[in-house]
Amino acid sequence: MNNTPREIPPEQSLIEYPCRFPIKVMGAHTEEFVTAMVFIAKAFEPDFDHATVEKRPSKGGNYVGLTLSIYVTHREQLDEIYRTLTSHPLVKYTL
């Protein structure tokens, strides 16, 4: 069985580019985590405003969910953002 993701042709994509795309990322509830995620967002969108980051702490307060709405221009850029976030050592999950 082949587990490689197949490419979705642009005409079949549900996302219309360019757009502001909300990315949810979860990690430890620390300022270091938030700062690192904003730094990554700014690497892809230099004008990214950290004040737009939505924060939702977990019930126990140990973790925080962030929503980063990043302006993306094409699918490859969105894929690269996800790869960068998921490879960061402070990130637990991305959606």
Protein language model features and the residues they cover:
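Long, contiguous binding/interaction regions
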Residues: M1-G65, Y71-L95
